[in-house]
């Protein structure tokens, strides 16, 4: 080094060495020599070049920096003259970034800002030295970072001997925070770095997914936005990456504060140190004291009051730790504005009342998860050529970790350098039990739980994804009451061991597997701990029989969860097997392969005289319970949930039994059930499911006591004829669907919100129907005896959905005010006159053979979005439709001839997606077809204009589609060909920012008129290619037809399918790739017809077409507009008649016709525009035409267009028209 630093040492330097980076012979002989002497007197090893003239090779010096623990970077006036000094500084920055080095800057007669901003002669020398060097940018970054670390300033007034002592103290303080080799327990030194104890290999992988996390956290800490002192909590489940995030934050922010400190591993430190040591450690760091064990905390507080402070507290686990630091935190809050405190914890409750805001660290997304896993799995060879062979397995491990960073690191590390066979073996082992290294992380949090919380955690694992109310009800018991159960759920939620989402209790997959591992360990110990049996091999294969026969083990079983789908062999239970299970709370025999639990072959044989003295049982689920009744010794005193679907039961139990806790009963499809007398005392019952209980004829009168019953399902109870008179005040949902002998419906609750009477034999609704003021849904589908709807329905002001489908005898709808109704289904009825429906959104009139026309007033239904007219075989015409209609289905309207002109109103701000279907409308007149195509064109134009204006067309989606009988591509399509494939050469700059979407057309023919389908879909694969690139194909929908409700139909005629879609994928790749280049582009389109999910060979695309749709520049007429296939202008919404290739006068303005692209020629003489002939395509390309000698006017018009004289062209055209 040119008069630079560092000594020659051949042996490996000892631990805790100091490297001095400096420039200048004068500095060496005086200040640096005194500093080296002082360091050595304090037993601190230091490296300095004693051989000024020859120095050391630079690579040796850089290696010494890597081996060092601390660097003293001494910035002096001549520092930037030396390339070696600056290259050393670059290396110092890299090492500090990696967390392997603590840097202490020393400003020798220079201001830190001079160094940081490269000012004055210091900066001039740097620019002169670095001129032309490609490393200049990295060097500037080093100068920007290192001086931002709090250092020591030596100015002209300083006493150098005192400053030397100050530097020695700072070095000693920093050394106390550096752990022994291999350890990661670093408490930051006074002038050090939070990552001092992080190995050099750790940095790279920790950045995966952390950039966005850091950005989000910094927004909550924003110093410009929040002027006062701010305390932020960083929370998340164990191993989620809180520590990594805090280290990144600390490293980025520490230079912005005059005092800063990170105290990590507070959970661990608190176990080995007295709590009063925590404030001593923190204050020592903040006060830059040589001895962090401060006895008098009052002395340095004034310093905190006067400075902006950054404090980072990591892994706080108990309130006492916060309380121990409270006094310092209060001083910081009351001190100078702008201080920041960050507290990381896995227990959110610790931050309550303490923090100003909370940042929750989320799981990594799939991309970052895969990167992190691959980094560790291939850490020694990131370019491993075989990595692609492991990709599928990698996906499996990433899926297993579910975005958990620590799990990804652990799994990747365990698989590093392992064969594919080992990877496969590891995956199979993980299916049985989690990695011990992952278990150990969660074990720390689990061990800190109380006994009640541990039981609650393990119980919840058995019922994850269930309703929160349900889980809390199961947990509530004599030893854990309702309040305690709620408290346990909240505590576990605060500790991120569970979470609640949409009212359900969820648990991360890793924690779920951990909970099972905890129970498995309990079974391998002395059996004294309560446990849950939930794996098939634990229960059947030498498990349950052994447990049930062992009195001590049986007494400690808390739950049995047996998936019957995994039982392969017949298994018999003895009548006495359950008598010793006095603590059993959860007994569940279920089938995971069938959610309806109806297809299980029960291979568990139960004796007739089974004993079941389960007094403590809360949850009893037994699929296909084989006995006629529960045993006499069964005691439901604590029973909360009873589920016995597809059972052989005739009644629950003999006689009356107390059921004070029973809230849920599900006996669905118990076809022999004939009595519900056992539920006479279930006064807290909330849900009762008796669907498919075909023998049940009546309800006991005692059911009127069920004042909390909110849900009653009697669907398919075909023997049920009536309900007793009662008032179930809490009942909200009543289902009587398919009760075919149920003739009279009594009003059993005024509070019903959803009432299903479909498929019943009722002929009329109750006289007091108006009492149902909360009724939202009334379903009377297929009530064939129903002849009229009472006028009292008009008084049901909350009613939103009325279903009268297939009420064959219903001919008249009452003249009532139903302005509140949103959904009205009248399909399959004989109603001829429509009611007033100002608010209806979904109207179904399909399969009505009586309706011949619709009321003209339907165009005023501004809320109407769906109109279903399928198979209205007498319908001959349709009026103008309202502007917000999104779906019109007129399939099979065989008498339909005409449509309104215009077909529907279009709003200037049109953004609605819409689909208009006229398939199998075989008598549709040509004028009607032309209006449909004209409407499609106007819809495309205005959709593009509105969406470009409102959201820039950033979302790729189908915006409009229609289909109708026909055999021609509409004339407004600019490119067309015969067949299913179209190739076009697009003009330069076709993909500029005005491109809003693409209009597509396909004429589809059925090769077999007798073929029947339930669905027909037309899609287009769009590919663009220029001179340099070929992009991935983009598939978009053109149109489709679906036979809803099952069944199939013929599509005999040829049909035209038109679709308009936004195309950001195509646009984006071109805009980003070559938006400024003037290159012609080829486009290739292939249209495909599918039936269901696969291509249908019985249908063929006869013709196809394409138009690109552009947004018109409203501020100016661009010369580029000459290339546009279709311009979007205000004039189009003003056109009252269809576009047929001529200019028409509309509201005092002239409208330019939609012209073809220049590859389609306009024939004319002397500037006159005639109806254009289509240029037919030969293999997707236009055939060449002989140029006429009378094309001068045509050419002149094109020149004027290119020069922007669009108005001249329009007037010239009109004049000659």
Swiss-Prot record:
Residues 211-472 form the NB-ARC domain. GO terms for cellular component: nucleus. The active site is at 88. One of its GO terms (biological process) is defense response. It is an enzyme of class 3 (hydrolase). InterPro entries: Apaf_helical, C-JID, Disease_R_plants, Leu-rich_rpt_3, LRR_dom_sf, NB-ARC, P-loop_NTPase, TIR_dom. It is found in: Nucleus. Residues 1162-1195 are annotated as: Disordered. A motif (Nuclear localization signal) lies at residues 1170-1177. Pfam families: C-JID, LRR_3, NB-ARC, TIR, WHD_ROQ1. Residues 14-175 form the TIR domain. Coiled coil: none annotated. GO terms for molecular function: ADP binding; NAD+ nucleosidase activity, cyclic ADP-ribose generating. Gene3D superfamilies: Helical domain of apoptotic protease-activating factors (1.10.8.430), P-loop containing nucleotide triphosphate hydrolases (3.40.50.300), Ribonuclease Inhibitor (3.80.10.10), Toll/interleukin-1 receptor homology (TIR) domain (3.40.50.10140). LRR repeats lie at residues 260-285, 436-459, 614-636, 637-659, 682-706, 708-728, 729-749, 750-774, 796-818, 819-842, 861-887. Its main location: nucleus. Transmembrane segments: none annotated. Its EC number is 3.2.2.6. Only two amino-acid changes (D195N and H950Y) are linked to a change from a susceptible strain (cv. RLD) to a resistant one (cv. Columbia or cv. Landsberg erecta). This is Inactive disease resistance protein RPS4. It comes from Arabidopsis thaliana.
């Amino acid at each position: 080094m040119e008069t630079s630093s560092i000594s020659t040492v051949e042996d490996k330097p000892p631990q805790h060495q100091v490297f001095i980076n400096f420039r200048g012979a004068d500095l060496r002989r005086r200040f640096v020599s005194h500093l080296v002497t002082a360091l050595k007197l304090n037993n601190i090893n230091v490296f300095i070049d004693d051989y000024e003239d020859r120095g050391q090779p630079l690579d040796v010096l850089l290696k010494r920096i890597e081996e060092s623990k601390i660097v003293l970077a001494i910035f002096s006036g001549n520092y930037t003259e030396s390339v070696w000094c600056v290259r050393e500084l670059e290396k110092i920055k890299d090492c500090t970034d990696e967390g392997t080095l603590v840097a202490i800057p020393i400003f020798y007669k220079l201001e830190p800002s001079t160094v940081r901003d490269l000012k004055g002669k210091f900066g001039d020398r740097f620019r002169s030295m670095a001129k032309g060097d490609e490393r200049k940018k990295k060097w500037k970054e080093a100068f920007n970072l290192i001086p931002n670390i709090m250092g020591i300033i030596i100015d002209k007034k300083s006493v150098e001997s005192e400053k030397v002592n100050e530097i020695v103290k700072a070095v000693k303080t920093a050394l106390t925070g550096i752990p022994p080799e291999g350890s990661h327990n670093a408490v930051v030194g006074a002038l050090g770095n939070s990552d001092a104890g992080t190995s050099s290999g750790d940095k790279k992988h920790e950045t995966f997914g952390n950039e966005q996390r850091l950005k989000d956290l910094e927004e909550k800490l924003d110093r410009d936005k929040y002027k006062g002192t701010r305390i932020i909590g960083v929370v998340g489940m164990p191993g989620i990456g809180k520590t990594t995030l805090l280290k990144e934050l600390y490293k980025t922010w520490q230079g912005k504060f005059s005092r800063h400190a990170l105290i990590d591993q507070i959970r661990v430190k608190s176990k080995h140190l007295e709590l009063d040591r925590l404030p001593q450690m923190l204050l020592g760091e903040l006060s830059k004291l040589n001895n962090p064990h401060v006895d008098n905390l009052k002395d340095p507080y004034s310093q905190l009051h006067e400075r902006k402070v950054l404090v980072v507290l990591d892994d706080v686990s108990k309130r006492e730790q916060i309380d121990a630091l409270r006094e310092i935190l209060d001083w910081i809050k009351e001190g100078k504005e702008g201080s920041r405190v960050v507290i990381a914890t896995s227990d959110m409750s610790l931050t309550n009342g303490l923090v100003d805001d909370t940042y929750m660290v989320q799981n990594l997304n799939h991309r970052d998860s895969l990167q992190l896993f691959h980094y560790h799995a291939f850490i020694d060879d990131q370019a491993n050529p075989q990595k692609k062979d492991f990709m599928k397995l990698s996906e499996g491990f990433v899926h297993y970790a579910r975005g958990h960073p620590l799990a990804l690191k652990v799994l990747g590390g365990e698989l590093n350098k392992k064969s594919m066979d080992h990877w496969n073996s590891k995956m199979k082992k993980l299916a049985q039990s989690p990695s011990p290294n992952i278990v150990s992380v969660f074990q720390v949090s689990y061990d800190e739980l109380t006994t009640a919380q541990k039981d609650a955690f393990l119980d919840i694992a058995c019922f994850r994804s269930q309703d929160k109310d349900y889980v809390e009800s199961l947990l509530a018991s004599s030893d854990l009451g309702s309040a305690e159960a709620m408290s346990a759920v909240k505590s576990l939620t605060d500790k991120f061991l569970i979470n609640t989402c949409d009212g359900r209790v969820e648990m991360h997959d890793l924690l779920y597997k951990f909970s099972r591992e905890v129970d498995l360990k309990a079974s391998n110990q002395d059996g004294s701990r309560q446990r849950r049996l939930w794996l098939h091999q634990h229960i059947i294969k030498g498990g349950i029989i052994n447990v049930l026969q062992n009195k001590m083990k049986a007494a400690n079983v808390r739950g049995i969860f047996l998936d019957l789908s995994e039982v392969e062999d017949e298994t018999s239970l003895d009548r006495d097997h359950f008598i010793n299970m006095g603590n059993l709370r959860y007994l569940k025999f279920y089938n995971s392969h069938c959610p309806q639990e109806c297809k299980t072959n029960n291979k568990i044989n139960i004796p007739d005289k089974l004993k079941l003295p389960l007094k403590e049982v809360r949850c009893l689920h037994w699929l296909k319970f084989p006995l006629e009744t529960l045993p006499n010794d069964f005691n439901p005193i604590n029973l909360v949930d009873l589920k016995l679907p597809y059972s052989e039961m005739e009644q629950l139990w003999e006689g009356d039994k107390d059921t004070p806790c029973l809230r849920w009963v599900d006996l669905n499809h118990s076809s022999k059930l004939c009595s519900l007398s056992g539920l006479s005392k279930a006064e807290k019952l909330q849900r009762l499911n008796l669907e498919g209980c075909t023998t049940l004829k009546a309800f006991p009168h005692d059911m009127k006591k069920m004042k909390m019953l909110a849900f009653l399902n009697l669907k398919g109870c075909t023997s049920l004829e009536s309900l007793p008179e009662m008032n179930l005040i809490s009942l909200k949902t009543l289902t009587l669907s398919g009760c075919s002998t149920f003739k009279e419906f009594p009003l059993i609750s005024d509070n019903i919100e959803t009432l299903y009477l479909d498929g019943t034999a009722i002929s009329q609704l109750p006289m007091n129907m108006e009492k149902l003021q909360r009724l939202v849904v009334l379903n009377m589908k297929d009530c064939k005896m129903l002849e009229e709807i009472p006028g009292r329905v008009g008084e049901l002001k909350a009613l939103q959905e009325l279903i009268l489908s297939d009420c064959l005898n219903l001919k008249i709808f009452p003249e009532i005010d139903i302005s509140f109704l949103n959904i009205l289904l009248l399909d399959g009825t004989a109603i001829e006159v429509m009611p007033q429906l100002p608010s209806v959104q979904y109207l179904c009139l399909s399969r009505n053979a009586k309706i011949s026309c619709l009321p003209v007033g339907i165009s005023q239904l501004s809320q109407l979005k769906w109109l279903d007219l399928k198979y209205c075989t007498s319908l001959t015409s349709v009026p103008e439709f309202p502007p917000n209609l999104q779906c019109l289905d007129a399939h099979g309207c065989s008498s339909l001839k005409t449509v309104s002109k215009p077909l529907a109103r279009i709003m200037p701000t049109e953004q609605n997606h819409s689909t208009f279907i006229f398939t199998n409308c075989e008598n549709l007149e040509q004028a009607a077809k032309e209006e449909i195509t004209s409407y499609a064109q106007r819809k495309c134009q205005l959709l593009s204009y509105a969406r470009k204006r409102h959201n820039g067309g950033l979302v790729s989606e189908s915006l409009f589609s229609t289909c109708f009988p026909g055999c021609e591509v509409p004339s407004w399509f600019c490119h067309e060909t015969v067949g299913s494939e179209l190739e076009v050469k697009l003009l330069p700059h076709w993909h500029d920012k005005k491109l809003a979407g693409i209009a597509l057309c396909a004429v589809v023919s059925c090769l077999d008129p007798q073929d029947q389908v339930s669905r027909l879909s037309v899609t287009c694969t769009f590919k663009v290619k220029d001179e340099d690139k070929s992009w991935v194909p983009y598939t978009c929908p053109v149109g489709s037809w679906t036979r809803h409700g099952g069944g199939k139909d013929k599509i005999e005629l040829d049909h035209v399918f038109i679709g308009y879609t936004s195309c950001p994928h195509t646009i984006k790749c071109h805009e980003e790739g070559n938006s400024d280049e003037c290159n012609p582009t080829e486009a290739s389109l292939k249209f495909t017809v599918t039936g269901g999910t696969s291509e249908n060979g019985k249908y063929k695309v006869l013709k196809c077409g394409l138009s690109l749709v552009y947004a018109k520049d409203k501020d100016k007429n661009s010369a580029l507009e000459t290339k546009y296939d279709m311009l979007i202008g205000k004039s189009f919404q003003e056109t009252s008649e269809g576009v047929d290739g001529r200019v028409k006068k509309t509201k005092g303005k002239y409208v330019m016709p939609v012209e073809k692209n220049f590859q389609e020629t306009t024939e004319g003489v002397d500037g006159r525009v005639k109806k254009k002939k289509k240029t037919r395509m030969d293999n997707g390309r236009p055939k060449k035409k002989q140029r006429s000698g009378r094309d001068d006017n045509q050419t002149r018009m094109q020149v004027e267009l290119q020069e922007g004289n669009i108005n001249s062209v329009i007037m010239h055209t009109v004049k000659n028209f």
